[in-house]
């Protein structure tokens, strides 16, 4: 019977495997800000200064909204096909390929629509995990 592999020490044994994966994912998310198809998607959805057309609802969404004393981001560029599928984590190659996709897999959503879509996807993953 094969032994369970022992996790490799990361960052001089200061990080667990989960911390390492979280770090890499965050660095990849940062890199997507410079990905041209994301900028192109935003440009095409722009109606006028500070307003974008939400793909999920008929509203013209402002770039930011004021909540109390804070300004919050109100626009997100969303992947139409989720980065992490319903079945869960597949691997780094799939993750990177999905994250750095072309414009036809991207849409601009207001915060309300993005939160609804994200919650729905998370719910589907949760149901799938319970059934397996």
Residue ranges: model-predicted function:
Residues 1, 130-132:
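Short intrinsically disordered terminal tails
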Residues 2-64, 92-104:
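Short, charged surface segments at domain edges that flank catalytic/cofactor-binding sites
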Residues 49, 82, 117-120, 131:
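Intrinsic structural disorder/low-complexity segments
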Residues 50, 73-76, 106:
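Residues that flank catalytic or metal-binding motifs in active/ligand-binding sites
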Residues 61-74, 117:
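Cys/His-rich microdomains that often coordinate metals
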Residues 62, 100-129:
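Short Cys/His-centered divalent metal-binding micro-motifs
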Residues 73-91:
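Histidine-centered catalytic micro-motifs used for acid/base chemistry in nuclease
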